[in-house]
Swiss-Prot record:
Gene3D superfamilies according to UniProt: YVTN repeat-like/Quinoprotein amine dehydrogenase
Summary of the tissues where the protein is detected: Expressed ubiquitously.
A GO MF term: protein phosphatase regulator activity
Cellular component GO terms held in the UniProt record: protein phosphatase type 2A complex
Positions of post-translational N-acetylmethionine modification: M1
Domain of life: Eukaryota
InterPro entries in alphabetical order: PP2A_PR55, PP2A_PR55_CS, WD40/YVTN_repeat-like_dom_sf, WD40_repeat_dom_sf, WD40_rpt
Protein name: Serine/threonine protein phosphatase 2A 55 kDa regulatory subunit B alpha isoform
Source organism per UniProt: Arabidopsis thaliana (Mouse-ear cress)
Keywords recorded for this protein, A-Z: Acetylation, Repeat, WD repeat
Subunit structure: PP2A consists of a common heteromeric enzyme, composed of a catalytic subunit (subunits C), a constant regulatory subunit (subunit A), and a variety of regulatory subunits such as subunits B (the R2/B/PR55/B55, R3/B''/PR72/PR130/PR59 and R5/B'/B56 families). Interacts with SIC/RON3.
Length: 513
C-alpha cells in the first residue's frame, strides 16, 4: 500500500456503508460449462502485505497471484485528499502455480488420502523469496517461491526449430543457428538413435561446437518444497496457523493440536489433546484453531459444541485446561435434534489487533471480545431463514457445510459466505447497522435485498449483543430459489484495504470498495 492509498483511505468515512464493485475474475466459466472436481477452489489466503494471494484447489495445486497496481497512483496530494473514491482499480495477475500435494494411500489403515488443499498460510518473506505452508488431510508442506534467472542453452549444433516428420532434428548450419536456444537447459525432443525422419545436411556436419549456457535478464518464479511435516496426525487436519514469532506454527485435527518449528520437520509437540480414554465418551471435536496475531503464547480453538477456548502456552506443556472459555449462554426451552449440529463452529479469525475474535457457525456470525467471556458482543444472522428447512438440509448434508469468515484489516467489517454463491458483509463496529448481500458474479449487487436490522438485546450488565439480518424471510426473498449446490465457502479480506477475494467453484472473484 503506497502513500496515495493511505491518504484516500484516511479521507473516507469508515462509518459510511461501503459500495462494493467488481474488480476481477480468474477462471470464469461460461454458461453451461461443466466444472471439474479437481478445479474447485478449497483455500484462499492473502499474505501480510496484501500484494500476494494464494489459492489451493481439490486437485492439490497452489496458484499464486501478485498485485500489479501498487505503484500506479497519480495526482497531487491535494487531489488525493479531496477524492472520495478509490483512485485506482486493484489488480492482480497470475504469478505461478505448482503441484503441492498428490493423492496417496495409507496401506496400514487402507485409507485413501486426497490431494485437496485444506488450508494455506503465508510465512514471513526473506531475501525476496515467498514462503508458505499448505496442507491436505495428513501432510503439511513448506514452500519457497523465488524468481530465478532463466538459463538458455545457445550455439547448438542443430536448429531445434527446423524439424521434419515427428519433430526430430533435420538440419544443421554453422551460420544460421548460432542464436538458437533452449530455455532453462531443456533439450529438443530427439530420438535416441537416428531414424527415417532424420537427415543430415549435404556434405555432412563440418564441425561440432560445445553448446553454451547463457543466463538471460528474464526471470521466472520457481517453487521448491523445503520441508514436509508428516505422520503427526491420526485424523484429518482442519487448520494450520503461523505464530507471530515467525518460527513456529500449529496444526490441528479433530482431536489434537500440534506445535511445530518451521526448521524441524521430524518432531512436533502435542499441546492440546481432547481424545478421551474411551472413544464412546467423545462429546466434541476440534473444528478450527488460530494463533493470536501479536501474542505468541496465546491461541484459540473452537469445537463442535459451539465453544471457543483461549489457551496460554506458558501455563503448561499440555494445555488441557483453558485460560478462557467463550460460549453462548444456554437458551431456555426445548432443544431439537439439530441444535448441536448448527452450533458447531466452522471457522474462527482474530482481528488484526487481537482483541476481537470472529466465529462462524451454520446459522450466525459472532464477534467476541477476548476480555469478556460472558457471551458474544455481537451476533449477525446469516441463515436464520433456513430454520424451517433444517430437515431438508440434513437430508442432503448441506447442514454440515463449513463456511469460513474473514474480518477487515481495520476491524470494522466482517464477511462470510452463503448459498447460491452469495456472501454477506456486516459492519461490526459499535452502532453500525451496515449489511450487504452480494453475489459472486460480475454484477455483485444483482440479487441484493435490503435486510432490516433488529434492535440490540441485553446479554448481561457487562455487555450487549447486537443481532442483525434476521428479519428477512430469505436472502432472495424465496428460500426455494436458493441453490444449495452452489455454495461460497471460502473468502479472504485484504489485510490493508476493503478488498475481498472469494471462491465460487473453480472461479476466483475479487471485489473492492
Amino acid at each position: 500500500m503506497n502513500g496515495g492509498d493511505e491518504v484516500v483511505a484516511a479521507s473516507a468515512d469508515p462509518s459510511l456503508p461501503l459500495e462494493w464493485r467488481f474488480s476481477q475474475v480468474f477462471g470464469e466459466r461460461s454458461a453451461g460449462e461443466e466444472v471439474q472436481e479437481v478445479d474447485i477452489i478449497s483455500a484462499i489466503e492473502f499474505d501480510n502485505s496484501g500484494n500476494h494471494l494464494a489459492t489451493g484447489d481439490r486437485g492439490g495445486r497452489v496458484v499464486l497471484f501478485e498485485r500489479t497496481d501498487t505503484n500506479n497512483s497519480s495526482g497531487t496530494r491535494r487531489e488525493l485528499e479531496e477524492a472520495d473514491y478509490p483512485l485506482r482499480h486493484p489488480e492482480f495477475r497470475y504469478k505461478t502455480e505448482f503441484q503441492s500435494h498428490d493423492p496417496e494411500f495409507d496401506y496400514l489403515k487402507s485409507l485413501e488420502i486426497e490431494e485437496k488443499i485444506n488450508k494455506i498460510r503465508w510465512c514471513q518473506t526473506a531475501n525476496g523469496a515467498l514462503f508458505l505452508l499448505s496442507t491436505n488431510d495428513k501432510t503439511i508442506k513448506f514452500w519457497k517461491v523465488q524468481d530465478k534467472k532463466i538459463k538458455k542453452i545457445c550455439d547448438m549444433n542443430s536448429d531445434p526449430s527446423r524439424t521434419v516428420g515427428n519433430g526430430t532434428v533435420a538440419s544443421s548450419s554453422n551460420s544460421n543457428i548460432t542464436n538458437s536456444c533452449l530455455v532453462n537447459g531443456g533439450v529438443s525432443e530427439v530420438n535416441n538413435s537416428l531414424c527415417n525422419d532424420f537427415s543430415l545436411p549435404a556434405g555432412g556436419i563440418s564441425s561440432l561446437r560445445l553448446p553454451v549456457v547463457v543466463t538471460s535478464h528474464e526471470s521466472s518464479p520457481v517453487a521448491r518444497c523445503r520441508r514436509v511435516y508428516a505422520h503427526a496426525h491420526d485424523y484429518h487436519i482442519n487448520s494450520i496457523s503461523n505464530n507471530s514469532d515467525g518460527e513456529t506454527f500449529i496444526s490441528a485435527d479433530d482431536l489434537r493440536i500440534n506445535l511445530w518449528n518451521l526448521e524441524i520437520s521430524n518432531q512436533s509437540f502435542n499441546i492440546v489433546d481432547v481424545k478421551p480414554a474411551k472413544m464412546e465418551d467423545l462429546s466434541e471435536v476440534i473444528t478450527s484453531a488460530e494463533f493470536h496475531p501479536t501474542h505468541c503464547n496465546m491461541l484459540a480453538y473452537s469445537s463442535s459444541k459451539g465453544s471457543i477456548r483461549l489457551i496460554d502456552l506458558r501455563q503448561s506443556a499440555l494445555c488441557d485446561s483453558h485460560s478462557k472459555l467463550f460460549e453462548e449462554p444456554e437458551q431456555a426451552g426445548p432443544k431439537s435434534f439439530f441444535t448441536e449440529i448448527i452450533a458447531s463452529v466452522s471457522d474462527i479469525k482474530f482481528a488484526k489487533e487481537g482483541r476481537y475474535l470472529l466465529s462462524r457457525d451454520y446459522m450466525t456470525l459472532k464477534l467476541w471480545d477476548i476480555n469478556m467471556d460472558a457471551g458474544p458482543v455481537a451476533t449477525f444472522q446469516v441463515h436464520e431463514y433456513l430454520k424451517p428447512k433444517l430437515c431438508d438440509l440434513y437430508e442432503n448434508d448441506s447442514i454440515f457445510d463449513k463456511f469460513e469468515c474473514c474480518i477487515s484489516g481495520n476491524g470494522l467489517r466482517a464477511a462470510t459466505g452463503s448459498y447460491s454463491n452469495l456472501f454477506r458483509v456486516f459492519g461490526v463496529a459499535p452502532g453500525s447497522t451496515e449489511t450487504a448481500t452480494l453475489e459472486a458474479s460480475r454484477n455483485p449487487m444483482r440479487r441484493h435485498v435490503p435486510i432490516p436490522s433488529r434492535p440490540s438485546r441485553a446479554l448481561s450488565s457487562i455487555t450487549r449483543v447486537v443481532s442483525r439480518g434476521s428479519e428477512s424471510p430469505g436472502v432472495d426473498g424465496n428460500t426455494n430459489a436458493l441453490d444449495y449446490t452452489t455454495k461460497l465457502l471460502h473468502l479472504a479480506w485484504h489485510p490493508n484495504e476493503n478488498s475481498i477475494a472469494c471462491a465460487a467453484a473453480n472461479s476466483l472473484y475479487m471485489y473492492y470498495a
